[in-house]
Amino acid sequence: FVDYYRILEQLAKADSCTAQLLQVHTHASGIVAWHATPEQRAKFLPEVVEGGKLIASAGSEADPKSKVVEVGRSELRRAAGGYRLTCFKHFASLAAAADYYLIWTAIPGAAPLSERQLFVLVPRDGDGVELVDEWDTLGMRSTVSWGIKITDHFVPAERVIGAPGCWVRDPRTFTLAYVANHLGAAEGAFEAALDFVRGRAYLAQSEAIKVTIGDLASRLYANQCALYAAAAQWEVAAGQGWDRPVLDRAEMMSLQALHMAKRCSLDVSERVFDICGARATFKSMPLEQIYRDIRTFTLHFRDDLYMVRVAEGLLDPETFEAKGKYKRMDRPAVAVAGA
């Protein structure tokens, strides 16, 4: 966990989008590695490790043009030898470059959605698969997070990954990867501002600018401590066989770290402009892209919903679950994924 987040943090210093695409691919590959059968792992993982194939995870059904809250509607239809799939996924980072799409969907039935949810692997060139270029955004542009429209695509049984409800039983979460990305991007902005100031004596000698630099450096350090304290707790949870209290503590720490990383990265990426002045707004400087990327990516999931989970876990610890976010899918009236 710790090494993985250090890699994402360092990549995000250079480019938040690149770090996000690696995150998407590794998370999708990790889901296949964890939930696939031995036969599926033997088939698909060598294609990734040895063949360099990419997998994009596609779960969001938050239509950018919709006026209603996102509701998971993707559901398989039984067919001879497998299933039929029709769905429209949005915000699918890596979609344009991926060889496979790991589609979050569900088997038909009356049980809550989280108990029916599983994954299917859909090849990019499969029948009924269409990419929709709807990615015209403020930032995170190079993630090329196009829509994936799938119409009556046949999914053979060997491409169904996991058992129904497998994800809410999987102890892992994605939370800290976003923390690492936000933190790394903010560190990239801060280091660019430091380089700018070092080259200009009139700025480097300003007491006001020194105060701001010291303040931002301290905020970044605090966020880094929060990230790696939570990552260490995940190491403990894995080492103790995913004991529920230890696991839940890891996710609680991760949610708090994510909240602080969102706030800190937004603050840092804005205040570096005050340090550097109007020249920092030119596209020859990296700060404007970093700011746009941070402003966009920190909206990935509604922070207020995360903080509700933290508060509820503090007020009634027995109700907190590491995978509680995904059980919100069972309550359609609740906003489950503000993208």
What does each model-identified segment do?
Residues 1-93:
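Glycine-rich flavin
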Residues 7, 28, 85-87, 120, ...:
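Buried hydrophobic positions in well-ordered alpha/beta secondary-structure cores of metabolic enzymes
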Residues 88-130:
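A short core secondary-structure module
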Residues 90-95, 174-178, 297-300:
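Glycine-rich phosphate/pyrophosphate-binding beta-alpha loops
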Residues 135-221:
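Glycine-rich beta->alpha junctions and the first turn(s) of the following alpha-helix
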Residues 184, 214-221, 255, 259-266, ...:
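Generic structural signal for well-ordered, non-transmembrane alpha-helical segments
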Residues 222-260, 273-281:
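C-terminal helix-coil-helix/basic helical segment that borders enzyme active sites and/or dimer interfaces
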Residues 276-339:
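Glycine-rich phosphate/cofactor-binding loops in nucleotide/flavin-utilizing enzymes
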